Amino acid sequence: ITYTDCTESGQDLCLCEGSDVCGKGNKCILGSNGEENQCVTGEGTPKPQSHNDGDFEEIPEEYLQ
């Protein structure tokens, strides 16, 4: 299983769907159009990434440091 994750708080690189939240000590606030999600500090859990059409792409390694 792979997990989507959030980058640093405040960056627009949340890879979550619906009301699911990301790990790394951040949670996701969804944008109104689904494309302006933001990471904010807060409790969160990793979200299992599905393998269906329309999946989010994995975050590049440089964002996970």
Curated annotation (Swiss-Prot):
PTM-bearing positions, type Sulfotyrosine: 63
GO molecular function annotations of the record: serine-type endopeptidase inhibitor activity
Matches recorded under InterPro entries: Hirudin (IPR024793), Hirudin/antistatin (IPR011061), Prot_inh_hirudin (IPR000429)
Record region (Interaction with fibrinogen-binding exosite of thrombin): 55-65
Entry function: Hirudin is a potent thrombin-specific protease inhibitor. It forms a stable non-covalent complex with alpha-thrombin, thereby abolishing its ability to cleave fibrinogen.
Family in the record: Belongs to the protease inhibitor I14 (hirudin) family.
Protein name: Hirudin-2'
Species annotation: Hirudo medicinalis
Lineage per the UniProt record: Eukaryota, Metazoa, Spiralia, Lophotrochozoa, Annelida
